[in-house]
């Protein structure tokens, strides 16, 4: 429900405000609590007199916000002094040049009701033993003066957000008021608008071990929303814990095309967008030209290393185009760049994957879609355990590849690197 003029009283937005960003703090335990008493629904009360920190969900929300903020031109942070707001700003870590604490960004004071439960009327109007809505609104209006500097970030509370929106004449919905959402308030010819900016969604295949697991962990740690595909959902739960608002699991079998469509469909159903695809699942079985050729194994290798990435690329392409800066990362190999042995199956299919990457780049470029081959030499995983050319400690580590994948997701369209050759020993690259 929008705030009324009666709620605002004499409070008015200051002159000279420029476009700015806003985050409501991440969730706390009180945000999660509701009860019903005598048929009336009551909500947890946390105002300026309740100084509690974020719960695990709130910390995740702050991480997601940080992913968004690091790509924005934040000129400075102005934060409420309450712990939940400070923790949100700290975890989000927008990396801007200045940080201020503003008492006027505190939540409304709910007096003796703090830490308990209250009816809707307590939040919508003046209420016994609570701070006057007009006085609260005047404080918020004063805090808005910080936005006279363009692109400042305000980190505060739900009540503050509702007053800000009312002062600027902007309608907001539950989508805007959710904990941890990054909002951009912008003005054109004295008309204000607000939009939600959320962190990118990346799909990653083959994530239960090795390179794929390191990629998924790195993306999660840096505030991406991820959709993870593996043959067994329980393996995903064992590796990453239960699903949450930023983490989606789906069955993915590189030999089962229907599982790929289902995975994309459920990702869209949960997140309503796809910004990146990492084709990591691969097959390194040995098909040796100097030995008898196992045609069935060669076909399996072709299907996993080339056909599955092709189908996933085709399924995701409409959503990647819609994002305007879609990213496809194909986990290739130095074996897709040169030939150093007789393992014809792996060499052929990785060269084929390079062809897919280049074709994807050609098709997607004008739509903002960028594709990259990451081509490592020996990586310290089970797939490289057969070699005695180099020890595991000297090999590329999965975490090294994960950083390159994230870098590919974050590079601008105007300066994209289409191939990363990654070496751990002296060898030919052609």
Swiss-Prot record:
Pfam families: adh_short, His_Phos_1. Gene3D superfamilies: NAD(P)-binding Rossmann-like Domain, Phosphoglycerate mutase-like. NAD(+) binds at residues 203-227. Pathway: Opine metabolism; mannopine biosynthesis. Keywords: Oxidoreductase, Plasmid. GO terms for biological process: lipid metabolic process; monocarboxylic acid metabolic process. PANTHER family: 3-OXOACYL-(ACYL-CARRIER-PROTEIN) REDUCTASE, 3-OXOACYL-[ACYL-CARRIER-PROTEIN] REDUCTASE FABG. Belongs to the short-chain dehydrogenases/reductases (SDR) family. This is Agropine synthesis reductase. It comes from Agrobacterium tumefaciens (strain 15955). The lineage of its organism: Bacteria, Pseudomonadati, Pseudomonadota, Alphaproteobacteria, Hyphomicrobiales.
């Amino acid at each position: 429900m929008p705030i009324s003029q009666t709620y605002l009283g004499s409070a008015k937005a200051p002159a000279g405000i420029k476009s700015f960003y806003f985050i409501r703090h991440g969730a706390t335990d009180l945000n999660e609590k509701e009860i019903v008493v005598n048929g009336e629904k009551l909500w947890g009360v946390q105002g300026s007199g309740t100084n509690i920190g974020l719960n695990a969900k709130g910390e995740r929300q702050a991480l997601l916000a940080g992913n968004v903020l690091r790509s924005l031109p934040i000129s400075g942070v102005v934060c409420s002094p309450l712990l939940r707001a400070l923790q949100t700003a700290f975890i989000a870590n927008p990396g801007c040049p200045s940080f201020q604490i503003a008492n006027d960004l505190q939540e409304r004071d709910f007096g003796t009701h703090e830490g308990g439960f209250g009816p809707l009327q307590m939040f919508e109007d003046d209420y016994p033993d609570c701070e006057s809505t007009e006085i609260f609104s005047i404080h918020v209006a004063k805090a808005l003066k910080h936005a006279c500097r363009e692109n400042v970030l305000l980190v505060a509370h739900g009540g503050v957000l509702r007053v800000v929106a009312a002062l600027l004449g902007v309608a907001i919905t539950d989508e805007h008021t959710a904990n941890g959402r990054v909002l951009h308030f912008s003005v054109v010819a004295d008309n204000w608008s607000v939009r939600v900016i959320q962190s990118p969604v990346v799909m990653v295949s083959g994530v239960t071990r090795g390179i794929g697991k390191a990629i998924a962990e790195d993306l999660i740690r840096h505030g991406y929303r991820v959709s993870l595909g593996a043959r067994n959902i329980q393996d995903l739960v064992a590796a990453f814990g239960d699903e949450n608002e930023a983490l989606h699991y789906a069955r993915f079998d590189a030999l089962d095309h229907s599982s790929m469509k289902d995975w994309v469909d459920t990702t869209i159903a949960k997140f309503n967008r796809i910004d990146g695809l990492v084709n990591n699942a691969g097959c390194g079985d040995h098909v040796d030209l100097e030995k008898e050729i196992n045609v069935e194994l060669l076909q399996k290798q072709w299907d996993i290393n080339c056909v599955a990435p092709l189908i996933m690329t085709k399924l995701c392409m409409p959503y990647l185009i819609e994002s305007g800066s879609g990213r496809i990362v194909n986990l290739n190999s130095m074996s897709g760049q040169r030939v150093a042995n007789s393992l014809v199956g792996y060499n052929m299919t990785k060269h084929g994957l390079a062809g897919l990457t280049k074709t994807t780049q050609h098709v997607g470029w004008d739509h903002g879609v960028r594709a990259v081959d990451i081509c490592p030499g020996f990586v310290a995983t089970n797939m490289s355990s057969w070699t005695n050319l180099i020890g595991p400690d000297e090999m590329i580590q999965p975490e090294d590849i994960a950083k390159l994948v994230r870098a590919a997701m974050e590079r601008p369209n105007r300066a994209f690197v289409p191939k990363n050759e990654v070496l751990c020993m002296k060898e030919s690259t052609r």
